[in-house]
Amino acid sequence: MRRAFYIGRFQPFHLGHYSLIKDIARDADEVVIGIGSAQKSHEPKNPFTAGERVMMIKHALEDAGIKHYAIPLEDLQRNAVWVSHIISMTPPFDVVYSNNPLVVRLFQESGILVEQPPMYQREGYSGSEIRKRMLRGEDWKSLVPAAVIDVIDEIDGVNRLKSVSKSDKDYRD
C-alpha cells in the first residue's frame, strides 16, 4: 500500500487543494492530509478551526471517493525536529507532496521521498484570495468545492471572518 502525505493550512480548503489531492490519489492508495497551524483560528489569516477544516476536507474528498486521513497538526517552532513531530502524529507514509521550500528541505534532509507537483492555478486558487473575496462580498464560492460552501455556511464563516478582521479602531467614537 502506498500512502502519501500533503500538508497545508486549508484556510479554507479550495479547488487548488482538491485538484492536487485528486492527482496525488491517482499515485497513492491513501492520502494523509496534515492540517497545519491547527491551533490557530478566529484570526484574519486563519479564520477556521482545525475541526472545521477537517469537516471541509472530509466532505469534499468523500464526494470524490478519495481515501484519506485529515490530521490536525499544531505548529512546532523548531524546524530541526518538525519532521519527527509530523511522523509521530500521522499514519505512516511513503512520499511527501509539497512545493513549500522549507517543507521540501526538511523532509529531504530526513531521507523521505518528496514529489513537487505542479501548482493548480495558484494565482486564483489561494486561501488569501478567497478570504479577500469574502471580506469584499465578491464571489468566492466558485473557488471551493460545494461541500466547503456548505461547511462555511453552517458555521457562518464569512461573518466570522468579517468580525475577526475588524480592528478596535473601527469602534472609536
Curated annotation (Swiss-Prot):
Signal peptide: none
Locations listed in the record: Cytoplasm
UniProt keyword list: ATP-binding, Cytoplasm, NAD, Nucleotide-binding, Nucleotidyltransferase, Pyridine nucleotide biosynthesis, Transferase
Domain of life: Archaea
Catalysed conversion reaction: beta-nicotinamide D-ribonucleotide + ATP + H(+) = diphosphate + NAD(+)
This protein's record includes keyword Cytoplasm: yes
Organism of this sequence: Methanolobus tindarius
Family in the record: Belongs to the archaeal NMN adenylyltransferase family.
Predominant localisation class: cytoplasm
GO cellular component term, pick one: cytoplasm
Listed name of the protein: Nicotinamide-nucleotide adenylyltransferase
InterPro entries found in the cross-reference section: Cyt_trans-like, NMN_Atrans_arc, Rossmann-like_a/b/a_fold
Record's keyword annotation contains Glycoprotein: no
GO biological-process terms attached to the record: NAD biosynthetic process
Listed GO MF terms: ATP binding; nicotinamide-nucleotide adenylyltransferase activity
Gene: ffdC
Its EC number(s): 2.7.7.1
Pathway: Cofactor biosynthesis; NAD(+) biosynthesis; NAD(+) from nicotinamide D-ribonucleotide: step 1/1
